[in-house]
Amino acid sequence: KKSDYIKLYVRRVFITDDFHDMMPKYLNFVKGVVDSDDLPLNVSRETLQQHKLLKVIRKKLVRKTLDMIKKIADEKYNDTFWKEFGTNIKLGVIEDHSNRTRLAKLLRFQSSHHSTDITSLDQYVERMKEKQDKIYFMAGSSRKEAESSPFVERLLKKGYEVIYLTEPVDEYCIQALPEFDGKRFQNVAKEGVKFDESEKTKENREATEKEFEPLLNWMKDKALKDKIEKAVVSQRLTESPCALVASQYGWSGNMERIMKAQAYQTGKDISTNYYASQKKTFEINPRHPLIRDMLRRVKEDEDDKTVLDLAVVLFETATLRSGYLLPDTKAYADRIERMLRLSLNIDPEAQVEEEPEEEPEDTTEDTEQDEEEEVDAGTEEEEEEEQETAKESTAEKDEL
């Protein structure tokens, strides 16, 4: 398939349109004409392809194209160009290192600032809160999933704007951008989300951490020993009881889903992958009633099977809330059933009632009925034969 639509003229004489890399792949939708007075006419097309001046032309073509795209009016750009070629621009950020800064200014994303309109990174930076030094983003399979994630709860409550990444290529694109306008990007589903706090707020946080230390240690060393890296008091949760947070170099839930889908298509096993095998941080909300009750129960009896079950159920629901997949859904369903039994005061050991055995059908009456029908049928046949015999005898007498 043809990937370049650039025609080359030398001194207004058509030379060729058979190029393979005059424009990068992400700009394969651009059509144009190049006329040069500096290229030689008396050389073969193969030699011309390797001419050093073509490298300069290629570089200028890309920059001219990006400048031209930048001049498109915002309304027309957002409504028309971005819908058609937005993915191309994102791929350009990933592939074209030399023009990454120019391409970043052309990016558009959904954000918490507006329910329908898309925003540029320039507009996001203009709206940033005072002392905010990072651009916050949340990735998900849809806007609804991203904005309902536990990771954005406190950010939205405090009035921070969050960019929503809803396409598979989005997270790759942002990872390729080290920063924008001096502001680094922060995935809110990973470690590193911090807020400015006063001395009093800091003291309260430290007191809370000390209060919940028995529960945090119990989770890390006993209940969730093989499942998490550590358990900490969360600064990002306001409504949810807990969340599962990836390290800075680990995969978010969205990225893990994408990688697993790609591995499934290629037949690769990612279970041994360094990023996939990294344990995550379990963050708890100290103000949530479930967490407070767990702290009380652990202090009373840390070997209570019900509390152990509850800790694992919380971990598994946090896994789902945080966008990850559960490796063992049956075990999760069994634990939920045990919790339901306890809440309804049903004996955990109560078994399912056995189905009643099917009784054999009573065939005695049917057999007697069949015999009666056979007898009746036989009697009728005998009567018919007697009537026919009588008729024949009468006929013979009449003849005599």
Curated annotation (Swiss-Prot):
Residues with PTM Phosphoserine: 44
Protein EC: 3.6.4.-
Site positions per UniProt: Important for ATP hydrolysis: 45
Glycosylated residues in this chain: 42, 78, 99
GO molecular function (one): unfolded protein binding
Keywords: Acetylation, ATP-binding, Calcium, Chaperone, Disulfide bond, Endoplasmic reticulum, Glycoprotein, Hydrolase, Nucleotide-binding, Phosphoprotein, Sarcoplasmic reticulum
Residue stretches of biased makeup (Basic and acidic residues): 388-400
Motif Prevents secretion from ER location, chain numbering: 397-400
Record field: catalytic activity: ATP + H2O = ADP + phosphate + H(+)
Protein function: ATP-dependent chaperone involved in the processing of proteins in the endoplasmic reticulum, regulating their transport. Together with MESD, acts as a modulator of the Wnt pathway by promoting the folding of LRP6, a coreceptor of the canonical Wnt pathway. When associated with CNPY3, required for proper folding of Toll-like receptors. Promotes folding and trafficking of TLR4 to the cell surface.
Family annotation (PANTHER family): HEAT SHOCK PROTEIN 90 FAMILY MEMBER
Annotated family: Belongs to the heat shock protein 90 family.
Protein name (Swiss-Prot/TrEMBL): Endoplasmin
Gene designation per UniProt: HSP90B1
